[in-house]
UniProtKB/Swiss-Prot annotation:
Gene Ontology molecular function, alphabetical: orotidine-5'-phosphate decarboxylase activity
Catalytic center residues: K62 (proton donor)
Enzyme class: lyase
Binding site for substrate: 11, 33, 60-69, 120, 181, 191, 211-212
Pathway(s): Pyrimidine metabolism; UMP biosynthesis via de novo pathway; UMP from orotate: step 2/2
Gene3D superfamilies named among the record's database cross-references: Aldolase class I
Source organism, top-level taxon: Bacteria
Lyase keyword on record: yes
Reactions catalysed according to its record: orotidine 5'-phosphate + H(+) = UMP + CO2
Family to which this protein belongs: Belongs to the OMP decarboxylase family. Type 1 subfamily.
Descriptive protein name: Orotidine 5'-phosphate decarboxylase
Length: 232
């Protein structure tokens, strides 16, 4: 059986709602993403609860601090048994290299370490506001290249950026793509650069982060398995 390409974002207000969803799916259907809101509310115990259920967990906390602090946070993530953890590439080479070094003692059991380049909600005007008068993709490519040079496993990127990043950085460099929608004609939230699951995989994405289209569906497992079938 092929590994799940879908990472479901558990963006629920209450832990009980998240666990109710989790009880409807299996680790062979998807992986799970825990973001800042749920982690801040429910902490490491919630992550460990999901790991004990057999799920691969992507801890999406986007660490961005001085190298020593980020290294310690990444190590703590590995201790929880997560499958993937991320940092902000804009923290720089030294920070990313420190994070990578912190995982060396874990060997094959180390989580994948990826970096966030440009948030998918950001457009050129947003970059200009913070002093970067360049197109978003130019900054994405710059940070993704730096991430690879620092020895990380991949980056988060929009699906529109995936094909160029794959050709520039190679097949082994993992691309994790949010902004996935089952119907791109409906723009209902804060992801500006969106694409369908099939198109994103064709573009070069390795893993797809999908939230509301699955978690808010009347029958989440049916939707999830339909997506998986389309990607088979």
């Amino acid at each position: 059986m092929t590994e799940p390409k879908v990472i479901v974002a558990l963006d629920f207000a209450k832990k009980e709602e998240a666990l109710s969803f989790v009880d409807q799916v299996t680790p062979s259907d998807c992986r799970l993403k825990i973001g800042k809101e749920m982690f801040t509310y429910y902490g490491p115990q919630f992550v460990e609860q999901l790991v004990k259920k057999g799920f691969d967990v992507f801890l999406d906390l986007k660490f961005h601090d001085i190298p020593t602090t980020v290294a310690k946070a990444v190590k703590a993530s590995a201790e929880m048994g997560v499958w993937m953890v991320n940092v902000h590439a804009s923290g720089g080479r030294k920070m990313m290299e420190a994070a990578r070094s912190a995982l060396l003692p874990y060997g094959d059991k180390a989580p994948l370490l990826i970096a966030v380049t440009v948030l998918t909600s950001m457009e050129q005007s947003d970059l200009a506001d913070i002093g970067l008068d360049i197109p978003p993709f130019e900054q994405v490519l710059r940070l993704a290249t730096l991430t690879q040079q620092a020895g990380l496993d991949g980056v988060v990127c929009s699906a529109q950026e995936a094909s160029v990043l794959k050709s520039r950085l190679g097949n082994e460099f993992k691309l994790i793509t949010p902004g996935i929608r089952l119907d791109v004609s409906t723009k209902v939230d804060d992801q500006s650069r969106v694409m369908t699951p099939v198109d994103a995989i064709k573009a070069g994405a390795d893993y797809l982060v999908i939230g509301r289209p699955v978690t808010q569906a009347a029958h989440p497992l049916d939707v999830l398995r339909k997506i998986n079938l389309s990607l088979a």
